[in-house]
Amino acid sequence: MAGHSKWANTRHRKAAQDAKRGKIFTKIIRELVTAAKLGGGDPDANPRLRAAVDKALSNNMTRDTLNRAIARGVGGDDDANMETIIYEGYGPGGTAIMVECLSDNRNRTVAEVRHAFSKCGGNLGTDGSVAYLFSKKGVISFEKGDEDTIMEAALEAGAEDVVTYDDGAIDVYTAWEEMGKVRDALENAGLKADSAEVSMIPSTKADMDAETAPKLLRLIDMLEDCDDVQEVYHNGEISDEVAATLE
C-alpha cells in the first residue's frame, strides 16, 4: 500500500522532540515501571512491557537504564502506582485527538489536559467521542529500505500491512501484541528498523491548512508538556506544501 510523504508530517516536529528528550525518557521510564508492575518483568511474556522496551531502544535509551526501570516495577516501586487514563477531544480543524496518560491523580491530569484543549481552540470530549476512529496497532518504521524485501519478510512474520511513502519511508503495521515478534523476525532477516512503537492509527484523516496546522502543533506541544501525558494521537494530516510554510 502506498502513502503520502511521511516526512512532511514529522520533520517540523523533530527539533521540538529532540529538545524534549529528557522529558521523553522520564515518561518512557514511567511506562516501563508500570508495565513491569502490572504484567511482570519478562518482555516476551508481557506485550505492554515489550512495546515499552522497543520504544525505549528506539529513543536510544541504554539497556542499563531500562533494566533498572523494569527492576523497579517488579520490585513494587511507588512510581508503579499509576493508572492509565485516555482522554478524547477535538482540536483545530476538526481533528480527532486521543491523549494517553499515566497518573496518580485524575483531577490534576484532567485539569491540565482540559486547559491545553481550551487554550488552543479545541475541546475535551466524552468517552467514546473519537475512540471509534482509531485502532491500536504496532508500527515498525524504516526511513529507507527495499520495499519488496521488507514486505515479504514482514508479511511472512505476521504483519497486517506494509505502507510505502512517497519519500521512501516504510511502515510495517502489526497487531500491537505481535509487534515484538514481527520486529525480531525482521531483524533476523537482516532488516533493522529505525523505530518501533505501539500507536493509535486513525481510520480517517483531517487535512490541515496553513491556519489550522500551527494551531494543532501548538496543542500537541502543550499536551506533551504535561508530565502525566504519555502519548498524543491525532488524525491531522499536514501536506508537503503546508509543512513548508511551518519551517
From Swiss-Prot:
Gene Ontology BP terms: regulation of DNA-templated transcription
Main localization (coarse): cytoplasm
Source taxon at top rank: Bacteria
Region (Disordered): 1-20
A molecular-function term among this protein's GO annotations: DNA binding
UniProt GO cellular component terms: cytosol
Pfam families cross-referenced by the UniProt entry: TACO1_YebC_N, Transcrip_reg
Family as reported in the entry's similarity comment: Belongs to the TACO1 family.
Identification of the protein by name: Probable transcriptional regulatory protein YebC
Organism: Salmonella arizonae (strain ATCC BAA-731 / CDC346-86 / RSK2980)
Gene name for this UniProt entry: yebC
